[in-house]
Amino acid sequence: MTHMALITMNYNSPTIGMHQNLTIILPEDVTFFDSSRTAKHLKSMLLLHGLSSDETTYIRYTSIERYANEHQLAIIMPNVDHSGYANMVYGHSYYDYILEIYEYVHQILPLSRKREDNFIAGHSMGGYGTIKFALTQSDKFAKAAPLSAVFEAQRLIDLDWIDFSPQAITGRDSQIKGTELDTYYLLDQAIDANVDIPELFIMCGKEDFLYHDNLQFIETLNKKGVSYKFEDGSGDHDYAYWDRAIKRAIEWFVQ
């Protein structure tokens, strides 16, 4: 077992126009400390938080560092506030910010740029971001794991949550069907463009309030001939489930 570096970073984001926090788990390969050896380029996962979470919650509520250590996987955890991983109408361009982070960490860290070495995962709102980036940035990620995902974005927009303003994301128009916020629309666009959609591993607990939304999205994948892997089983919309799910996702990513 190797040691893991836990990096808490604050850097000035050109996209957001202010300093942003970023948490990174990085395997400390022996080549990093020996100038006579060629440094190893690591596989990495972009891990997206949910609506009530941030860049620290996977570190605090799961065993993500131990799972990453077991498989020598770098984990990149950004913070996007309540943005829905979108370029907000009244707010910051968080979709573009995630793309900025991808480029930034691959420049400053010993991460492989090969598509087959890059993965993306996230829960709830982060699951929504996961499927959105899988469909629109498919050249970057070989595999994607949406966990307890919001596949029907209208549900996110209609959500009554503490200090959450969906109008900040969408503008005054609350109708998102057929827009870049609509995962079903993005799926159709990817299929029409003959995009090489990343392999999908969808997980959701049967007690989760989003379970039937997940089944509906899977039904659509079946109808459109898009391959995927699916696991459900017992589990609610909580970190007890996401701890198990992210472990399964990491094992699948590196197999």
Per-segment meaning from a language model:
Residues 1-255:
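Non-catalytic cap/lid and distal C-terminal segments of serine-dependent acyl enzymes
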